[in-house]
Amino acid sequence: MKLVGLILFFLTFFSKLQSEGIYNAKSFQLKNGMKVVVVENKRAPVVSQMIWYNFGSGVEEKGKSGLAHFMEHLMFKGTKKFPDNYYSNFISRIGGSENAFTSYDYTAYYQIFPKYELEKIMQMEADRMVNLTLTEENVEIEKKVILEERFQRVESDPSAKLDESMRSILFPN
């Protein structure tokens, strides 16, 4: 009975949020083909921005596994306009947070920050999409970071190794 009451509460609560227009999504496409979805939340002066690229580990060529995850890391290395660590330091300095993740079908980057910085964050995001600056040094550093992540997440976990083996059979590339 308590479970039914709890479910009814959440259904009522989220229906109210939807009816008040708190989570109404609007979507459109830019001239360059990029799809944009905006979900406005009027409860706080904060923005959550996510950029999803249709490039994940499932589309990597044979012999190039890990490239999507590697690029995810390298995208934080900066540009001429916003050098190494500027992006992350800026978001942290304004009280925001950011991260990224790679899946089989996509790589996603997200930030949460005060809405008054939206224009600046979007400029930085657009800049790193086309002006990423890589050096041999920062490529080598990230390579070591990824190998350590692999050791922690896969090599030291038998179930993760099994999962990886099964996926290599299901998806030969």
Residue spans of the language-model regions?
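Intrinsic disorder/low-complexity segments enriched in polar/small residues
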Residues: 3, 17-19, 150
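Sec-dependent N-terminal signal peptides
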Residues: 3-13
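Hydrophobic side chains within alpha-helical segments
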Residues: 5, 72-75, 145, 152
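Intrinsically disordered, low-complexity regions
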Residues: 6, 22, 57, 96-97
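A general, composition-driven signal for non-globular sequence regions
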Residues: 10-12, 29, 63, 67, ...
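His/Glu-rich zincin catalytic helix
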Residues: 17-86, 110-113, 119-129
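Acidic/histidine-enriched segments that form metal/cofactor-coordinating
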Residues: 53, 79-80, 87-173
